């Protein structure tokens, strides 16, 4: 347990930030899963629509610091490639 007042404050702050970050990551995963479900069903229009909603959420994760830029780019790129492959 922390002894300094500032360290005790940081423990509380870290816990609350961790909770918020966990919620953000869960939100991103939910949107990505919706895209993956649409891809699995083979509905290209639904997949594109879900992708257009999910893409800004993934980028917001980068802005908020819960995802690395390369991770977000990789997710977006792979989802986009899978959507394009539906029609081919």
UniProtKB/Swiss-Prot annotation:
GO cellular component: small ribosomal subunit
UniProt keyword RNA-binding present: yes
Function in brief: Binds directly to 16S ribosomal RNA.
UniProt keyword annotations, A-Z: Ribonucleoprotein, Ribosomal protein, RNA-binding, rRNA-binding
Protein family (similarity comment): Belongs to the bacterial ribosomal protein bS20 family.
NCBIfam families associated with the record: S20
Annotated protein name in UniProt: Small ribosomal subunit protein bS20
Lineage, uppermost ranks: Bacteria, Pseudomonadati, Pseudomonadota, Alphaproteobacteria, Rhodospirillales
Molecular functions per Gene Ontology: small ribosomal subunit rRNA binding; structural constituent of ribosome
HAMAP family named in the record: Ribosomal_bS20 (MF_00500)
GO biological process: translation
InterPro entries (UniProt xref): Ribosomal_bS20, Ribosomal_bS20_sf
Originating organism: Rhodospirillum rubrum (strain ATCC 11170 / ATH 1.1.1 / DSM 467 / LMG 4362 / NCIMB 8255 / S1)
